[in-house]
Amino acid sequence: AHIVTTAFTTDELLLCRAEAFIYQKDYDRAVADIQAWCDTHASGTTVSRSAINQYYGSQATERTKKDLHPKFVIENGEQLNFVNCILHLRRIETVHEGLRWFDIKRYGIEVTHNISGGNEDVLKVDDLRRAIQIPTDVIGAGLTPNPR
């Protein structure tokens, strides 16, 4: 079978660039990129700094705001609100592409899976399962595998 995969889409790159602007505290340019993304995904939506701060600065919901545990500094307030906005939009944009994993690892987001019978499996921030395993041929050549 022949499968074509798009390595980078314009929509995803807009969100990546907006995230870079957020860390530069250039919120106006981040808003412009977020607005460009929304123009193709949510017609009639107008984005502003105040709207992002109001929505993502409010009480967390399971879908819009996660507890973040990154190994880098995110300032509370406007920067955190914008980061939560970008993570929410990236979750929507990359839902079928497997890219959420990179945000989960980078931002230390805990993930809970509900299992039948009422049980839960929680992937905590320090869980060894977060490490991507070294390929088996490399392990076979003598390199120690990542602990699980």
Language model region names:
Residues A1-R148:
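Acidic/polar-rich alpha-helix caps and helix-coil junctions
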